[in-house]
């Protein structure tokens, strides 16, 4: 099965580089290229890609608003936001807009391919090296944590709540399984269950909710390795 990728970036050299990486990999193909947010929205509608690589800073319409409109349109495409580094203050907003993850632009070709495959599989890109730092940084800018727990969170079992806390720390399925002494299949089952109960699309949205609800706060968490 071929994964079709829409590349959205205002720099032609960047688009060309991504195209070369994608076309060199079996099972991946480029669905199209957009140089701004408006083109991204139009091509997402016209080409029906599986994955969209979305730059944040583009002319006419930025990647954040493009992401929001594509998600709101009901597109099945999974959106991977591209950023220069964690100083990019727009990444958090893009994730809130419905992106399924993000990747540094200087990632190695193999990392880009892996990210596309992860997103296409319906998962979210939550690498601890990037995700936790970014979410912690932007969580500090959030309003004071809520004094009451969102109703949906009360529907989670104790184990699902624990899984959500660990997800917010950027743990992978394998790391979650090791921490909880269960199989990866069991972890996936817990994640699917909590996403369904919370009415969320993917893990990224679950992590955002955990921070916004005060379930997790920036910095080391109880039980983290020293």
Give residue ranges: language-model regions.
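Receiver (REC) domain active-site loop signature in two-component systems and cognate sites
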Residues: 58
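Short, flexible helix-to-coil linker/hinge segments that flank and couple to helix-turn-helix
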Residues: 91-96, 101, 106-158, 162, ...
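Active-site residues of response regulator receiver
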Residues: 9, 55, 83
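Acidic, metal-coordinating helix/loop segments flanking the phosphotransfer/catalytic sites
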Residues: 33-51
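Short amphipathic alpha-helix used as the core "switch/output" element in two-component signaling
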Residues: 42, 64-76
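Recognition helix of helix-turn-helix DNA-binding domains
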Residues: 170-205
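Acidic catalytic/metal-coordinating carboxylates
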Residues: 36-39, 61-65
């Amino acid at each position: 099965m071929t994964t079709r990728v829409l590349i959205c970036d205002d720099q032609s050299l960047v688009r060309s580089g991504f195209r070369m990486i994608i076309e060199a990999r079996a099972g991946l193909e480029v669905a199209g290229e957009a140089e701004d947010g408006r083109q991204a929205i139009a091509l997402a509608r016209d080409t029906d890609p599986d994955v969209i690589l979305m730059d944040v800073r583009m002319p006419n319409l930025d990647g954040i608003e493009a992401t929001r409109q594509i998600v709101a349109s009901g597109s099945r495409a999974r959106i991977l936001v591209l950023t220069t580094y964690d100083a990019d203050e727009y990444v958090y907003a893009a994730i809130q807009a419905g992106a399924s993850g993000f990747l540094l632009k200087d990632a190695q070709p193999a990392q880009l391919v892996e990210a596309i495959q992860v997103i296409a599989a319906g998962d979210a890109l939550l690498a601890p090296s990037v995700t936790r730092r970014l979410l912690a940084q932007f969580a500090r800018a959030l309003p004071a944590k809520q004094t009451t727990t969102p109703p949906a969170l009360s529907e989670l079992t104790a184990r699902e709540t624990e899984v959500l806390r660990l997800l917010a720390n950027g743990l992978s399925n394998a790391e979650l399984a090791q921490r909880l002494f269960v199989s990866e299949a069991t972890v996936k089952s817990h994640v699917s269950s909590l996403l369904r109960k919370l009415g969320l699309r993917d893990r990224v949205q679950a992590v955002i909710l955990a921070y916004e609800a005060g379930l997790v706060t920036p910095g080391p968490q109880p039980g983290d390795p020293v």
